[in-house]
């Protein structure tokens, strides 16, 4: 079970009810939870009435337009230098396609992730110089390439940087620096992604020629790419990002790009009814995979081609890569699980750090995100090869992983990222010192670590779950970073029925509240792992959508997480923090509970008799606390850890436990955790 946390105060919803255009109260609660304080702001947000910004007002845009237009007119050799993620790929395609259409002498280059790494390098720059390039335009990179751009300038090459990443202390000596990070935090353009910045450059070039704002017309041609990049790069969907994504989704629904049509067909995505999820979970991962484990040029050619047969062939190649990526991810997760079985104390570090040999660098970030979901804490996956270690980190809200890494960076060869995700490189021999420094940093700055939570927008009553209300909720779209699909809490309902669906991988259940019955689906939760029984009282975190089937529209309720009603969340959080401190050998005043042999015996007997246990730590706690007197969350965590250390129990993947027969007698004193608890 994940812990629940409310967003902003949804009780302020009354201020958002517009006299002439009343909104459903539950929608007002969602708006209030997202910091929208008055009716005027609500109308602007819901209707996307804010006009697009003048591209010429962006930092150095006039300089950039002058340089690029002159290069086009004079037939100079132009290089579009991109990045290997979805944002960088689409930005490259967008700008290259435009410049080629303008008759420019243009080519593109995107470095390969594994062999070259991110951004401009000296080796690449020498290649660019020798090829006779006269103008470099970077997209989705360049702002930190100080030495590389200095070398380009020495060789007489003009450089225009378009980027959106954080500004370094020393800026590169480019001829123009067009970066959304230069804009004020209040600017609608502050959080534009790389492809959106490339779009702004195109718009400025067109505006210079036409004398009027061309952005609406340009979006008809490039809006699909801008929307894909914005959602794929997980930039905040506020300001202009919200407008560009909403308009871009409309363009994507009617796109004629053969590559996107072929990609969508393989993903079984209906572009005519596309939404944010279509991009985030179907299209973007497939574009990204070429930069992770394949050749990024496959995706570029897919998006550029006008040949349907070529598009189908390229999309098929990408589909194979995506299947291979899944296999790699599963292998890393399995090896990580084996590592945790051998070293279970790793689970109780403030930052879960797992180290392996030759794990694919294009996949370790995805694996880190999966481990974070399961263990509810920041996670770092490090892959070692030939003495070099490369890590990918994912974090939880409230703990900036990039700040932590930066504070411990003296042993790092390079690093970068943002509060929720980061990457780094170091010598393999420096891993122990680096991870120890991270733990010290976390202990000093976060006595109690933030945990991965389900962010709730507002409570909802069963009678509010109607087609009309959910249709109104669509006005909040597009959904994404800082504007996710609303998560509602349906509190105090009773489990009426639970059935297995999807070959046992998911479940469908019905809950009741008074005279109302609400059917819902819990994806990824097999019935065997579901700890609740008919008649149990539960609180359900859920998302709502419309299901169209046989010309009938009904509300679909998707379960995100479930708590037993009355779940002592705060108490359990404190117990978890106290127990983790015990395992780490730290002194803590909170670890005052007495743990006895009898506590362990009762837990072991139940788990042995019901092994394998196909539910998680919290699920089995819910079951055991009803069977064992005085069974607390602290004792539960202690019992599981002691059984791990004594090799009486093994964690299953993706969740659950298997108990070993235990034919030979074990001594509890052989468990370090048991000994520490006796001292306490």
Predicted regions mapped to residue ranges:
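Short alpha-helical basic/polar micro-motif
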Residues: 196, 365, 369, 540
